[in-house]
Design a protein with these regions (language model features):
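Cys-dependent protein tyrosine phosphatase-like superfamily
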Residues: 1-115, 127-190
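Ser/Thr-glycine-rich phosphate-binding loops at phosphate-binding pockets of nucleotides
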Residues: 120, 124-125
Length: 190
């Protein structure tokens, strides 16, 4: 499917048939036209899931744009970057904490359509998306398919990243169905 914004790789609406919930990678190079498009489509609540260091070093222009409400609510759980492919699901499960409750509540109770994002729109954004879709009553299959769309959208970027950073194991950073399935098994009833 690709990104609905030209300056991002992984911005897309959740499969709800509208723009109520839009997940994204870092929207750091938005054009004036894209900002207008977001505003015209009522996507005016912005939730930044990045940790403090990312937030400070790579600001998002939407924080200062008139007509937008900006919330910096970093995903706090999950710990360090996983050291093995098997540890990715555990990292995801660690994200489900009180801060995650606040994030989900802010997104689901927003008065406008919401765009939420992290760096790549993959891990933190993927867990948030899975929880939102689960709360909305979507099947595990729909949730997994949404998560796996990130793999399609980011594959070229991830391969290039590993080429530039050979110490990174591509099997850790590529989205895998079993990782989000573990999250869904941990939150069967919300």
């Amino acid at each position: 499917m690709g990104s609905i914004l030209q300056t991002t790789l992984n911005t897309r609406a959740l499969p709800t048939g509208d723009f109520r919930y839009v997940r994204s990678d870092y929207p750091g190079k938005l054009t004036d036209e894209e900002v207008r498009w977001l505003f015209q489509n009522g996507i005016t609540t912005i939730v930044d899931l990045r940790e403090e260091k990312e937030y400070v070093s790579r600001p998002c222009r939407l924080e200062k744009e008139e007509g937008f409400s900006y919330y910096h609510l970093p995903v706090t759980g999950g710990g360090d970057t996983p050291k093995s492919p098997e540890a990715v699901a555990e990292t995801y499960l660690g994200m489900i904490d009180e801060q995650m409750d606040k994030i989900i509540s802010t997104i689901m109770n927003a008065e406008s359509n919401v765009m939420y994002f992290c760096g790549a729109g993959k891990d933190r954004t993927g867990v948030v998306s899975a929880i939102i879709l689960k709360k909305l009553g979507y099947s595990d299959r729909v949730i997994i398919d949404d998560y796996m769309e990130t793999k399609e959208n980011l594959m070229d970027f991830l391969v290039a990243y590993v080429r530039e950073h050979p110490q990174v194991d591509i099997n850790i950073i590529i989205p895998k169905e079993e990782n989000i399935r573990r999250v869904l098994e941990a939150i069967p009833v919300l």
